[in-house]
Amino acid sequence: KNEIPTLGEVRGKAVLATRFDDKLPVGFERCGLYFGWADQGDRTIRADPTADSVINDRETLCVQDRYNYDVDDKITAIHTCLDNSRAADDTFFLNFTSTSGSGKVGHPKEYAKHINLDLYDYDWQAGTAYGIVIVDFAPKKIAEKIYQTNFQPAQ
């Protein structure tokens, strides 16, 4: 299908997603989901660090991929995207937690240590659709916290 599937529809299956522009010959149809968004590699700090786009020219896509922000600015960008996703049921979110920062630390794994500590302490809400959160060097405890948001809170 050329639309965003539900989790139930894709359980146990692969979903193809691309970001490159595939010029197809006449008569061929694009396969999978096309995620196109503008590069976010500049270091300009923005009140809204996300970029809005569309998936397959139909569904709204919101992406946070500020990969050159320093740790504190990156954490703010991640939180902004997570908080915005709570209020937008009709938008698909991609939230990249990775950064290469200013290069002062030297390796993305060092940045990830700081960001992952913050992610662990974030107020994750059960039953909330955060979209896809892409985490570098994620320890099991963070993966579990994010995974648990897929379930409704106990009554």
Give, region by region, the residue ranges found by the protein language model.
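Catalytic cores of phosphodiester-bond hydrolases, prominently lipid phosphodiesterases
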Residues: 1-155
